[in-house]
Amino acid sequence: MEIPIQVAVRICPYTEPSENRKPVAGAEADASAFGNAEAKAESFSDSEDNKNDASNRQRPEESTDANGNSEGGRQLKKETLPTDSNGNENGTIVPLGSGCCVQAIPISASALGLPSALPGGRAQDSIAAGLIQVGAHTVPVTHALGSGTTQSQLYYQTVFPLISLFLEGFDASVVTYGQRGQGKTYTLYGPGFECVYGEADQGVVQRCVRDIFAHIAGHSERTYAVNVGFVEICEGEVCDLLDMGNVHCQSVEEVFRWLQIGLATRQPKSAHSLFTLTLEQQWVSKEGLIQHRLSTASFSDLCATERWGEPPPGNPRDAGLQMLELVVNTLTDPSIMYGVNGNIPYGQTTLTTLLKDSFGGRAQTLVILCVSPQEQHVAETLGNLQFAFKVQCVRNYVIMNTYSDDNTPISPETMPNGSSNPGAGPLAQVAAGDNFGLQFAASQWFKLVSNAEGLFAKLMASNLISELEKEQIEEWLFLKQECEECLSSTEAMRSQKQLVPIQEAEEPEESVSEPPNSDNDTDNESQRPDLADKLESLMEEFRAKTDALIQSKHAEFLTKHPKAVMQSQERDKESKLDAPPEKDKEKIEERKTSIAGRRRSIQPGASLSTAELALLNRVALQQPTAQPPPSVLDPESSIDPLESSAGEGLRQAAIAAAAANAPIEQLQKKLRKLHAEIEGRQRQLKEIEQTMQVKQNIISELVKNSDTRSHAKQRFQKKKAKLEAECDKAKKHLAKALIQGREKGETERWSAIIAHIEHRLEDLSSMKHIAGESGQKLKKLQQSMAESRKQQEELEKKIRKESKLRDQLETELAKLKESRDGASGGKELVKLDSPEQQGRQLKAVQARITHLNHILREKSDNLEECAGGEGPAPAQQESLRHEIRNLRGTRDLLLDERCHLDRKLKRDKMLTQREERKLLECDEAIEAIDAAIEFKNELICGHKSIDTSDRLQREKGEQMLMARLNKLSPEEMRTLLYKYFNKVIDLRDSSRKLELQLVQLERERDAWEWKERVLSNAVRQARLEGERNAVLLQRQHEMKLTLMLRHLAEETSASSASYGERALAPGHQTSSGDFDYELDFYKAAATTTTTTNHKALVKPPKSTPSGAALEKYKDKEQRGAGRNIFAKFQVLTRYASSAASAAAAGSCSSTVDESTALIESTTTATATTTTTTTTTTTGGKGKERGLPNIRQDQLKRLMPAPTVTKVTRQKNKIIIQDASRRN
């Protein structure tokens, strides 16, 4: 809902100055408003500059607010003025000659038929719009209020509609704007809460509060929560006037009480104030739905505009008001909006940030402009009216803040029981099952705390706050983190409680009574660390059951399926297997050739040994028994052993062996990687366990020694308080010496003493901080323990997973090795153990016999065709057989040469480049001879030639190529064949070299991967070892630091003598009352003169103390520091400072220097001193002056406390050495 901002202009009442009234100095003679409020405001502002002027003082019962507005101003009694037909008061429009130039021209709504703004009000009360006329200028506004408008009329006409929307769940905002002394604060808050004023003068805020609580009382079925807040913005800083944040209120009286406290706390200087009231409501609608609404009403009292500069209207002096005008200009001017790309500068100032919802936001806004009718304020009035006119063009996107819980019907258990008391507290009547309001409030508080955390972080980074404030902020941040942990644990419990099973309507109640427990058990198990193992085991079980179910269903389907369909499926399969398409054939052949040629030149199984070659020759030359004569010999039967002897079968066997070895090698490689990973992770796990044990020891020691640290901190605090008191005394004496104009040496001495005490105070603060940071260390160690525990769980999970994978790979590797060994020993007879294996073997033999019968039948048919004369002539067949024998002889020679090269390769492990090429030529020539023998055998069998059988199916280009080849002469054909033969050899040679390079690169990659794995494990191991060593050092440091702090506490308590007790001796004559403080402790010049039964301390004559005495005392203390325990404490503090600044390495050195200075100065503070007694003589240059005698108790008080730390220091030294030796 897009609604423009409403503007109401209220003219301040004007009264002619009385002639007999004494004019107020500094104020304008004609400035008077609600009960001389303006004159009073001017006098208040002038009184800041002229405080001694008696004429600036006003009556004590009249006061102004922080903005100079009249809070106690009351309207003067004004005669009843006649009204015109429109209900306008003619008497309020003062002519220009009388000093007023602003007129309000309200437009009555009675003629328009609009309802009255007041319930049952008159016609003149129903003002809908109006004009403000300033001289010749006229400005239209939403509400034009004359000087005679009362507080009640203003409220019901302008503010009451906003409060109605506020009670429905919309945000509302009321902003007062104007120059100084025109009644802005009076409009909002009235004259105050004094009993002398009636309710008729109450402001807008009080009336809104009464209406809100009246509405609450009238709807007793609703639960509610009302919170108020009151802040002040002064020079960009936000100040909480209530010092409580948002305060919960249950009645009108409580709100008024807090409002009165806030008004009394406001600053007298110019500032903005913001009073907010938040209403949270919840009820059940007639449809049974839970309705939840949250609305906020803000009342902003802005400071005076005080425009200045050129052009004449000028700009407000306040930076917040200037930025507010810039925001309004941006919202109303499309060119400016386009220039900033839609980024409205709300965040430039604090005021615009807080008023973001009021101007261009989601609140219904009313701006009340208070103007002056006087001529001298015309420029500022026009400027403010121009701003108000622009504000009316701003549109807010008003929405209802409702939360209906996704239209969830409320259950009978969560219905409110009976009528609830409105004053019972926030959401007190909500049933136990409905905690939505509390959850929403918690979320809102979480947002506020997050914003506060950001502000605190900025303050910490700005370095504009003291150390005490920093400690408070750090403590607040730790408390916030603890609250977040508590909330996270409660959220987890809540999420577990909300996971309930869905109850089916048709199931009985007994069946649904048990599942919640099982669900809760599973939810609880989800928090356990062994969840992954259980889940994996369940997945394996599920997978096995699924496979078994699929197999059973498949078997059942096969048994129940019709045989006709099964036969049709088998015929389809057979047709597909018998007649594959030619493209598939070509792909299969290409795949076979690629597999056969892949790495054949470098695999040892591809070569033929001498024994194998002899065996193959015997098989080739031997004629098998029970076969037909050579004339009718089956050519294919004669080529089968040749094909096997040609190396195809052995090649296939070599390829199969290589294929069998490849997965074994891959598995072995994976196993090596897994072994390395498991060993590395086990070492890391061991390091983490040791580190966790050391951390746990540190935590237990910190908890055990917390009392010692707190005791030391208290001692340091007491010592710091004593030193602060001594510093204050020294400063007083220094000021006294400066006022009395004493000698320069004494002032320098006091200045040196003060500087020394302040230095000691800084050292004590640092020591107190070191003693008090055990809580932070404990929290950090606990967080580190949690992180280490998480790392331990992750490592254990990875180790279990990798161990399981290793077992699987080992099982698979064992199976592969068994299968390979069984294949290599295939010549041996294997006894079948089970009848199933015998049945499978029998089926395989029967299938082989069937296949051989089919081959024999085909070959007999071929023989019959040859005998019938379909094949070539007998002479031609004999010629072809002769050529085949010649080719076999050539092939045998090539095989002998190849075997010779193989033996040389096995013996020497390398060949020359020419021999490698010769080996490839032999392989290729053997393959070519095999192809030629196969071609001639096909000719003998009467098959068509390969070149002519598929000529009709060739493309046109191939046909032309074959025609050209057929026309070539034998010489040309041999030349072409030799050329392509060399090209094939070159290609195979390059392929072999590439394969060798690939193998080498793969080996290098494996080596680099192994190195990388080893190095990464070493780095992780080193990191964990370093962490463990650091924790060990920290433990040693904490032990030593605890002993040092215990000893320091004892020394601090023992050294009870302070600067006040060690009197400081001045350099000139002082009174006897200051004698105890003026004894010079830093200077061993105190003398004792023994008179008749009296001991007196006499100052040296004409002695002028200087900084040398202080330096002498410091040197003496530093010499004694060698025997003090602070020498060891310095080393410990250096470690603490470096550990504390681990995030910023650059600050380590400065921290060490500060710790060193801390130890040296603390040594000075705890060293015991002795007073040196000297005898004064009468031969001095100056005149001796006797001092009054001192009693014995005073002398005892001046004596330093005896040292009690010598024995304790030796004990602690022995303890530290023993602890270091054990660690």
From Swiss-Prot:
Please name the GO terms that the record assigns under molecular function.
Answer: ATP binding; microtubule binding; microtubule motor activity
Task: From the UniProt entry, list the residue stretches annotated as the region Disordered.
Answer: 13-90, 494-528, 560-604, 625-646, 774-799, 1162-1188
InterPro entries per the record?
A: Kinesin-like_fam (IPR027640), Kinesin_motor_dom (IPR001752), Kinesin_motor_dom_sf (IPR036961), P-loop_NTPase (IPR027417)
Q: Which residues form the Kinesin motor domain?
A: 4-394
SUPFAM superfamilies given for it? Answer: P-loop containing nucleoside triphosphate hydrolases
Q: Where in the cell is it found?
A: Cytoplasm, Cytoskeleton
Q: Does the keyword ATP-binding apply?
A: yes
Cystine links in this protein are: none
Keywords for this protein: ATP-binding, Coiled coil, Cytoplasm, Cytoskeleton, Microtubule, Motor protein, Nucleotide-binding, Repressor
Comp. bias intervals (Basic and acidic residues): 39-62, 569-593, 787-799
Stored Pfam families: Kinesin
Which GO biological-process labels does this protein carry? Answer: microtubule-based movement; mitotic spindle organization; spindle elongation
One GO cellular component this record assigns the protein to is: cytoplasm
**Coiled-coil intervals:** 658-743, 773-825, 982-1015
Tell me the superkingdom of the source: Eukaryota
Q: Which SMART domains match?
A: KISc
Residue ranges annotated as compositionally biased, kind Low complexity, are 1162-1178
UniProt binding sites for ATP: 178-185
- Its biological function? Regulates cubitus interruptus (ci) processing by recruiting multiple kinases to promote its efficient phosphorylation. Scaffolds multiple kinases and ci into proximity to promote its hyperphosphorylation, which then targets it for SCFSlimb/proteasome-mediated processing to generate its repressor form. Hh signaling inhibits ci phosphorylation by interfering with the cos-ci-kinases complex formation.
Q: Which family does it belong to?
A: Belongs to the TRAFAC class myosin-kinesin ATPase superfamily. Kinesin family. KIF27 subfamily.
Annotated protein name in UniProt: Kinesin-like protein costa
- What species is this protein from? Drosophila pseudoobscura pseudoobscura (Fruit fly)
